């Protein structure tokens, strides 16, 4: 997740006294407004709990009123502080930090704690209505959905809630996975748009975990609905013969066999992103990026209209970063949710091991850069858990030992999706046009691009990074 404090506001408290509010943005969207004193209080709590050596530097208190230049300097320092805390594996996942952000989000949006009904969507478009509190965090809502569907406790960790934006043409854009520091009801309500919805989707990448999910009736139905949906939207490539086999299995109600066949298809389990821009293999190339199978897959359109395909393995990414910058927009095109006439430009850049001794930066300019980063991080996390002999099931067992999950008695069946539509003939043409990228002959990132706007820098080292030999290339 990308934290930034791009702006400040002078506001008045209940006594009429003015103060400076620092607007904390997550992924380019306002999450909360906080005062310096609130962040100082958080810092003191963290310092008391974890010690001075662990906690990053915090901007000192000033005796006199700050000048505008000093306010801006403090804004930058607080931004770096929030980014440092969030990126620390201990501090960033601490309940102290996350509860502070949840409370600040609720106070900023001025939403009182009360019982409400929240709609969660399944991949097949089915709505699940859950009764929650406005102050319920993401995990609480996920558990409420699982309870409504009668999904067993041990399978809850295989799924996550995602914020998506529906398009007029029926497609959807995955904005982000909902995090532990936010309140889902507040997050979606604060967007003030019916285009956004929360979707339940599997949260893992390794297809071996499918077997655990398919052993349960509800888990099988959820995975089946997601697979059908991914095929319908063209995320999974299917030729005519494969489509005929899938349709036959669907008509027989053979859901497990349907999924088993789908697992053999290209891009099964991938998340596809909206068309965006990359500097690889050439600057300004249009690209469609997919995340799955521990890689980022590129479908690149070169300046000569030629289509090429290539993949970047997460184990060869030494590190990556997300940067944000404010970009002025023309009159009438500014984002209505923003008070300033600026859009946030997001970039994901990763340093990739192209050959044994050659690292190269590759940059993607996309409003979904954060979601791409989340995908990379979850792939790395999954690889590290597997490397240490762990699994999702073992993690859930530990969680249940620490505290049992509460469930209601209400249940709701997961409906089967409709029969597959006929395959889009244009999808096969894309496969025929694409050829493999040659990493040896392609140019990399220019120095001007790699510098970027580091004021909103979100840097990630990769613990799953592996060296390679020439025989791997």
Curated annotation (Swiss-Prot):
Residues 114-433 are annotated as: FERM-like. CDD domains: FERM-like_C_SNX17, FERM_F1_SNX17, PX_SNX17_31. Its main location: cytoplasm. GO terms for cellular component: cytoplasmic vesicle; cytoplasmic vesicle membrane; cytosol; early endosome. Residues 403-414 have a biased composition (Polar residues). The keyword Electron transport does not apply. One of its GO terms (biological process) is endocytic recycling. Residues 114-205 form the Ras-associating domain. InterPro entries: PH-like_dom_sf (IPR011993), PX_dom (IPR001683), PX_dom_sf (IPR036871), RA_dom (IPR000159), SNX17-31_FERM_F1 (IPR048763), SNX17-31_FERM_F2 (IPR048767), SNX17/31_FERM (IPR040842), SNX17_FERM-like_dom (IPR037836). It is a peripheral membrane protein. Residues 269-433 are annotated as: PTB-like F3 module. A 1,2-diacyl-sn-glycero-3-phospho-(1D-myo-inositol-3-phosphate) binds at residues 35, 37, 61, 74. Belongs to the sorting nexin family. Critical regulator of endosomal recycling of numerous surface proteins, including integrins, signaling receptor and channels. Binds to NPxY sequences in the cytoplasmic tails of target cargos. Associates with retriever and CCC complexes to prevent lysosomal degradation and promote cell surface recycling of numerous cargos such as integrins ITGB1, ITGB5 and their associated alpha subunits. Also required for maintenance of normal cell surface levels of APP and LRP1. Interacts with membranes containing phosphatidylinositol 3-phosphate (PtdIns(3P)). The PX domain mediates specific binding to phosphatidylinositol 3-phosphate (PtdIns(P3)). Required for association with endosomes. The PTB-like F3 module within the FERM-like domain mediates cargo recognition via their NPxY sequences, while the F1 module (Ras-associating) is responsible for interaction with membrane-bound HRAS. This is Sorting nexin-17. It comes from Danio rerio.
